Amino acid sequence: MAVRLRLAHTADLEPAELRRARALLDAAFDGDFSAEDWDHGLGGIHVLLQDGAGLAAHGSVVMRRIRHRGRWLRTGYVEAVAVRADARRTGLGGRVMAELERVIDRAYDLGALAASDEGALLYAARGWQRWGGQVHALSPDGVVRLPEAEGGVWLRPGLAGPLDPARELVFDWREGDVT
């Protein structure tokens, strides 16, 4: 069965498409995909892969700002990547990531994401690099360190060039998980 790819901004998705994407994510994360997690994946570009059984895979890239060495980098942040259970290990996750990476490479200074141990295998195989330095956020109370995020942030160097792990990353603030 042929798999159809659709690339669209959140604003161009029909309500039914958004509901199907949310249902896929809820199922893929065993109900551990919160309203804040969903919100983090909106407002950017979505990759949707459809097969004969419906929505098989999804991922999105949204704009964030990350400061490094005093410069705020326009960052394509990967969110909400999932593959339907019966379609896993068929290359669909790689197809989603290839499209997201194409968007990142053409439109952003840097790509970034936070990965689970299981997801990290996919990202490492695709050339993403685990960030070895400190992670901070610009919170309402000022810059705060996020030691729990360290080791879980992955980067795709782009137009910004290589980053120095001796210097911290400072993420813009958002509700819920900052990274």
Per-region residue spans from a language model:
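Conserved active-site tyrosine of GNAT-family acetyltransferases
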Residues: A21, Y123-A124, W128
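Conserved GNAT acetyl-CoA-binding A-motif
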Residues: R102-S116
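Conserved acetyl-CoA pyrophosphate-binding loop and the N-cap/start of the following alpha-helix
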Residues: D86-E99
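A conserved beta-strand-loop-helix scaffold within acyl/acetyltransferase catalytic domains
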Residues: L7-A82
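Conserved beta-strand-loop-alpha-helix junction that forms the acyl-donor binding cleft
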Residues: A112-L122, A137
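Conserved N-terminal entry element of GNAT/NAT acetyltransferase domains
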Residues: M1-P15, E168-V178
